[in-house]
């Protein structure tokens, strides 16, 4: 988690002053990812990938399919695929590719790697989303089949995620490959060459590096960085204070979860009625206005609009009541619950950046109006709430509800889990959607999660970048960045 010292604006100014010290290689595009961990090829079975690892794996360890600049699916190791009419079988035909050591890529290699992801010992964060995968089978040397226990229309989007990137002996198949060349300390140089018959080869050369937010913003403002990836709500105010063209700041229209989840079983939040009062008295419109992200809308439901197979979720009954009236009633209810001489103090675990300060101030004001004090979690005040800020890997609504199953949350609903299990095994789309809606309604009724909006993901895009596009999954390939994007459908 990024840490922002108090004089962060001075830090950016100093970095801007010294930013021009490095000579730019005009041939390479300089891409920076916000984060402290360097970009390294990792094994997703070992657990969560850092932001820089996600970007690197997306670009050097393609799966059967991969994302294009717009977040659409394009061929990866598989040159084509076919889905059975019942949605229970995906058959992929591999291209004539090779591993970096020169060995031909065989279907049995891919089947083994994907099966390893599904094993109980795997800590791959994508494993739960693949619960409907019954078997991965190599049918011939170049044909592989993924068999499902129930239809999953979003399977291709899952297979394109960096967590399902395929590596052998620590190396992937591209499209970019690490190369040796002089580069900034901590950076990794990546190259992709596409051979063109009767024309010059297409060449992508990228220097990829991870750095703290202040450094990435300074590098971009000074012209040292062509592209910055990985921005969130927490560091967004830093960009707004820097002298950067408004057109350079780009937001991904992501789906996902951005809100508060219970951090422990005990404490005041064990009371469902108190959780409900807190949920009803947040001024989400004011929070969204303070974040000032184009297209960002306040959200009071676990599910969001536009998810696969679901109508827009019904809004809670209380949402039609003006916020002032909600607070007035909640103030009375809190005094009845606690008594005038027993005020409630809640602690929240948040990042340390300026965006989190905006969020904390808004929540403290909203809940202070009903007689509840909010403080930052520390050694004395254990967290009652913590922040969830996660982008959905696809448009599947199942991911939203399964984020709150009993195996991962301290407070949960057995009834909601049962509905999730029924949704996982349902073979009819309407039945599956009904079970997911049931699970979401149970979870919302108990206020185990307090939704605020969709996540915020931003990038800084320089003038040398022509092949960048915002997309719903916030995944950005580093090939073709210096080529103008074709219109959709071309």
Regions found by a protein language model. Give the residues of each.
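Aromatic- and charge-enriched surface segment that lines or borders ligand/interaction sites
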Residues: 56, 80-123, 219
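Periplasmic-binding protein-like
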Residues: 265-309, 359, 443-448
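Gly/Pro-rich hinge or "lid" segments in bacterial periplasmic/extracellular proteins
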Residues: 150-207, 214-215
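Extracellular/periplasmic solute-recognition and catalytic clefts
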Residues: 182-195, 207-265, 389
